Amino acid sequence: MHNIHRRNFLKAAGAATAGLVTANIALSAYASSVAPKPQAGKSVIGLIAPKMDVVRVGFIGVGERGFSHVEQFCHLEGVELKAICDTHQAVLDRAVDHIVKQNRPKPAVYTGNDLSYRDLLSRDDIDIVIISTPWEWHAPMAIETMESGKHAFVEVPMALTVEECWQVVDTAERTQKNCMMMENVNYGREELMVLNMVRQGVFGELLHGEAAYIHELRWQMKEIDHKTGSWRTYWHTKRNGNLYPTHGLGPVSQYMNINRGDRFDYLTSMSSPALGRALYAKREFPADHERNQLKYINGDINTSLIKTVKGRTIMVQHDTTTPRPYSRHNLIQGTNGVFAGFPNRIAVENGGFGQSYHEWDMDMQKWYDKYDHPLWQRIGKEAEINGGHGGMDFVMLWRMIYCLRNGETLDQDVYDGASWSVVNILSEHSLNDRSNSVTFPDFTRGAWQTAKPLGIIGA
């Protein structure tokens, strides 16, 4: 310190103090957003919407992900595709052409500007809206959808801030409309089989889970003017944390009955250095290209640890940058054994097929024969034909429509969407506070303690 000139030292000290003040203000704002607010309506746990003979559907966003939903909906019975909205004419034309080729009526089309979706929402012949837009639009569009008297089905993540999560929850409770974040991985064959096994006690009392989104997506940086990379790349310059937690976390949460007898209590998070995106840009783009002018701050690998109120632990990882095979981990450990994914393998002490729990059993067929989930037994072949991430997309949409047409509760509610999505911002808060733990908001306002556990869905 003696080498620092007094004036520079005072400047440095002032800057440090200002930084601490800013950090304290941010943490104070976060702390105030954690506390439950006065309830504007009533809980939507177990919400059942009036039965619909035919579900009338509107789509906001029919580009990459949205078009895949349009394709899947064309295979479903009991639905009418009433209207679509997007800001890009080419993807609108593609969606309309596909719908007409499937011998369905031509939908109404809305475009022109970023707010054209409001014209779609003003219609009185739409029951549900499928939202597949860039992340920052998810919460506002879901809120406006419910305000317009429609059920919202939104892509992941549901929201990007704690306050947005509360706003979506509050709107669902006030309007008594469904807001389901469409976590498709919960409907994968392996994930549903494991849910079935957990509910039948195969792994004993649950202790620990591991979830991840490990998916090398640097190539999306080459999508400059349109498609996912044209907007998703910039999130690596805005935040440092787990940008995309729900694909791995959703299934593990349902195994553990999160928000239905247990809930997330607190989280701590760490990130590696942010190196890979800049290196990729340097290698793949000219030196003066915009991708080389960006400052990438999101750590290449983020690892967060969650503690539940019942004392269980969950590791959640995010890595869309390093060169490695795809994985969601999908590990669930109990007092009697463990399942782990990528590749699928099982070890149990009692109730298995004679193998030692000291070695992995990687022969899944006998486990499928015994524990394959009722949903996959019912529509698995149809799902495999129609596709969508191995069939999970079709199963999810089929199940959504089934529940709406038969007056059943959806498998995922607004509290799930908020709890799984908020890991994004909580991981950032923890990182900004030297990886100290941060508290999860209780979006159920205590109702998790009496909520009915999630059973073997669709059984």
From Swiss-Prot:
Annotated binding of substrate, by residue: Y213, R232, Y244, P245, T246, H247, Y326
Organism: Shewanella baltica (strain OS185)
Signal peptide: 1-31
Keywords: Glycosidase, Hydrolase, NAD, Signal
Record family assignment: Belongs to the Gfo/Idh/MocA family. Glycosyl hydrolase 109 subfamily.
Record note on cofactor: Binds 1 NAD(+) per subunit. The NAD(+) cannot dissociate.
InterPro entries per the UniProt record, alphabetical: Gfo/Idh/MocA-like_OxRdtase_N, Gfo/Idh/MocA_oxidrdct_glycsds, Glyco_hydro_109_C, NAD(P)-bd_dom_sf, TAT_signal, TAT_signal_bac_arc
EC number(s) recorded for this UniProt protein: 3.2.1.-
Record protein name field: Glycosyl hydrolase family 109 protein
Gene3D superfamilies membership: Dihydrodipicolinate Reductase, domain 2, NAD(P)-binding Rossmann-like Domain
Cofactor list: NAD(+)
GO molecular function: hydrolase activity, acting on glycosyl bonds; nucleotide binding
Function: Glycosidase.
Residues annotated to bind NAD(+): E64, R65, D86, W135, E136, W137, H138, E155, V156, N184, Y244
PTM description: Predicted to be exported by the Tat system. The position of the signal peptide cleavage has not been experimentally proven.
Domain of life: Bacteria
Coiled-coil zones: none
Enzyme class, first EC level, given as a word: hydrolase
UniProt entry tagged with the keyword Zinc-finger: no
